[in-house]
């Protein structure tokens, strides 16, 4: 069954294959273009550097008019990531635009890693450490990076 959402996701997949953004990858799971596995590599020169963070993206038939649900599978310590892996990111909520594609979503998440929004924390402990004790925050992030290699 071909729907607008499925056609759009196939275009997104083709773009990810032919023009992948640096440090991110994603593809649909076998036999279901509506669920994708993704990986974000921690950006260089940040506490997340060298991390390999796995995510799952779930799309509904309303895509691209409705954003995907995106969740980290890898354990994360970040002000905008809930304990269950869900993200607090404006473009996945009230600032979504149908012009965003999978690549744009993943690069936005990659950018968020080193530029958290502490005004809207999902993880209050991480947010407080980021603001008040950067050394301890970096230590905790580096522990997360090391765990990401084992995932």
UniProtKB/Swiss-Prot annotation:
Q: Which residues form the active site?
A: 88 (glycyl thioester intermediate)
Instruction: Return the PROSITE patterns for the record.
Output: UBC_1, UBC_2
UniProt-recorded Gene Ontology molecular function terms: ATP binding; ubiquitin conjugating enzyme activity
Subcellular localization, as worded in the UniProt entry:
Cytoplasm; Nucleus
Reactions it catalyzes: S-ubiquitinyl-[E1 ubiquitin-activating enzyme]-L-cysteine + [E2 ubiquitin-conjugating enzyme]-L-cysteine = [E1 ubiquitin-activating enzyme]-L-cysteine + S-ubiquitinyl-[E2 ubiquitin-conjugating enzyme]-L-cysteine
InterPro entries in the record? Ub_conjugating_enzyme (IPR050113), UBQ-conjugat_E2_core (IPR000608), UBQ-conjugating_AS (IPR023313), UBQ-conjugating_enzyme/RWD (IPR016135)
The similarity comment for this entry is: Belongs to the ubiquitin-conjugating enzyme family.
PANTHER family, sorted:
UBIQUITIN-CONJUGATING ENZYME E2 (PTHR24067)
Q: What does this protein do?
A: Catalyzes the covalent attachment of ubiquitin to other proteins. Plays a role in transcription regulation by catalyzing the monoubiquitination of histone H2B to form H2BK123ub1. H2BK123ub1 gives a specific tag for epigenetic transcriptional activation and is also a prerequisite for H3K4me and H3K79me formation. Also involved in postreplication repair of UV-damaged DNA, in N-end rule-dependent protein degradation and in sporulation.
The name of this protein is: Ubiquitin-conjugating enzyme E2 2
Q: Which organism is it from?
A: Trichoderma harzianum
Task: Name the gene behind this protein.
Answer: UBC2
């Amino acid at each position: 069954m071909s729907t607008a959402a499925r056609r759009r996701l196939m275009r997104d997949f083709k773009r990810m294959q032919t023009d992948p953004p640096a440090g991110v990858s994603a593809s649909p799971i076998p036999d279901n273009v509506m669920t994708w596995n993704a990986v974000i590599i921690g950006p260089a020169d940040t506490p997340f550097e060298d991390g390999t963070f796995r995510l799952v993206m779930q799309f509904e038939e309303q895509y691209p008019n409705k954003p995907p649900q995106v969740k980290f599978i890898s354990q994360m310590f970040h002000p905008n990531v809930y304990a269950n892996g869900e993200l607090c990111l404006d473009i996945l909520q009230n600032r979504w635009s149908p012009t965003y594609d999978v690549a744009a979503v993943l690069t936005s998440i990659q950018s968020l890693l080193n530029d958290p929004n502490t005004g809207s924390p999902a993880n209050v402990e991480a947010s407080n450490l980021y603001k008040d004790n950067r050394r301890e925050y970096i230590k905790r992030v580096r522990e997360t990076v090391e765990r990401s290699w084992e995932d």
